[in-house]
Structures are given as C-alpha cells and as structure tokens.
Design a protein with these regions (language model features):
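Short catalytic helix/loop segments, enriched in acidic residues and glycine
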Residues: 27-42
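Catalytic-core segments of class I nucleotidyltransferases/pyrophosphorylases
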Residues: 104, 119-123, 153-235
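Residues in the short beta-alpha loop(s) of Rossmann-like NAD(P)-binding domains
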Residues: 38, 60-64
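N-terminal nucleotide-binding beta1-loop-alpha1 segment
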Residues: 1-26, 55, 207
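Structural beta-sheet core signal
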Residues: 10-12, 57-58, 104-105, 130-132, ...
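A short, N-terminal amphipathic alpha-helix
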Residues: 38-55, 69-70
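Short, structured coil segments at secondary-structure junctions
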Residues: 28, 52, 73-74
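Conserved beta-loop-beta/alpha segment of the NTase-like Rossmann-fold superfamily
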Residues: 65-154
C-alpha cells in the first residue's frame, strides 16, 4: 500500500550549464547526448512514462533552444528557468505550472541499467520524501564521485548525509543518493533553496526515506561516466 492518492507529476530539470561534460554536450546540452541510441532526455522521459506518469514537465533554459526543439510534439510540458539557479529553483519553476503536491524529480544525466527507479519510487512511496539509493559495490562504481553519500541508515530511514567531496572517488560499498526522488510538501515547508541542506534537515527530523535499488548506476554527467556508459552499451 503506497501513500499516493494519485500518480504524481514529474519534473526533469534540463536548464543547467552542464559544465562537468561540456566537451560531450550536443548543441550546448548535456541532455541531448546520445547513449544506446537515444538522448539522455528521451531515456528519462520514457522511464517516467513506463512508470505510469502522464504529466511530465521539462525545465529548460531560454539559452538552450535545442531542448525545446527536441521536444516538439513529444507530449510533455516545457517551462523555462531564466537563470541556472540550481535544482530547487528549477523545480519551483515547474511547480508554478503544475501547482503543489508530491512530485517525482528525475535528473536526465544519469542511467539505471537494470531497473526502472521511478516505478520503484512510486511502489514504495508512503508519504515521506523518498530518494532512490544504490550501493556502490561493483566495477561500475569507479566512475562515481564522492557526493550524495549516506552515512547513517536505519532500515529505510536516512539519518545522515555526508558533505560533497567531488574531487574524491566514491567509497566502495557505501550507499549513494542518485538522481531520482519524490519530494513532498514537507520538503518545501523548510523553505531552503539548497536541496542538500533540506534533505539533511528532513533526515534529522526522521522524515527522509530510501528506496534501495540493485542496479548499475551511471553518472553520464561527467566525462568518465559518459565513457563508461558508451562502453557498457557497446560491449
């Protein structure tokens, strides 16, 4: 039994500058990088559709017209984030279009090879902010950086998240937050413009849960992850 009265809408933030993989971006858009025959943006939309989500909002930028062009007749809503002011601001832009309520946040620069994480989130949601989490225990984890590391987990309750250390490799065997989540109104009640500090506050309040999935997780948003993704699907 889930905490969903109805399937939530989803948001795909695609307005960022993509500085981590500028060398591979297509027309200035990391979301249009092609992996396994489809753009990362299309992979993300299909994942959400296959999870049963019908209302999808893509947050683009007036400086990234190629995104809008790629989505012509695709059946998704498009809104623009005037400036690249971060993830929380991007989702706020989508909320202006869709209104309040639970929303599934899906970053378009990550891939899950063996599972539909959005479907798992919907099936496990019980009313609290819920994050898709993987254990970095395979060769695939070598392309990850030390961000989003969970340092205390009891059952499925997240109690502590580490600081970001993007210059370090992610520690093998540790749990990592990924680019999928359901944000509830409790997230917005904290009125914090930084998603990491908001998640930490929710964790300290006992209001943050983990959906742990067993899959290879690829961060295509960095050059090493991009190369790994290409080698994975071309092997």
């Amino acid at each position: 039994m889930t905490g969903l009265e109805s399937t939530p809408w989803a948001v795909i933030p695609a307005a960022g500058l993509g500085t981590r993989m500028a060398e591979n971006a297509v027309l200035g858009c990391k979301e249009l990088v092609v992996v396994n025959g489809k753009t990362m943006l299309e992979h993300t939309i299909l994942e959400l559709e296959n999870a049963g989500i019908e209302q999808i909002v893509v947050v683009s930028s007036p400086n990234k017209p190629a995104i809008d062009k790629a989505l012509v007749d695709r059946g998704v809503e498009i809104v623009h984030q005037a400036e690249p002011n971060g993830l929380v601001d991007a989702v706020k832009c989508a909320r202006k279009k869709m209104g309040e309520g639970d929303c599934l946040v899906a970053l378009p620069d990550v891939m899950f090879t063996n599972v539909n994480p959005s479907l798992e989130l919907l099936s496990e949601f019980k009313g609290e902010t819920l994050l898709t989490v993987v254990r970095a225990d395979g060769a695939w984890a070598t392309q990850l950086r030390d961000t989003g590391r969970i340092t205390e987990l009891q059952g499925h309750k997240i109690h502590r998240i580490s600081s970001k250390n993007p210059d370090r490799a992610f520690p093998k065997g540790e749990l990592r937050i990924t680019g999928r989540a359901i944000w509830t109104e409790a997230f917005w009640d904290l009125k914090d413009d930084c998603e990491v500090s908001t998640l930490r506050k929710l964790a300290s309040m006992g209001k943050l849960s983990a959906s742990i999935v067993k899959t290879e997780y690829i961060d295509v948003g960095n050059s090493k992850g991009y190369r790994y993704a290409q080698s994975f699907f071309n092997r």
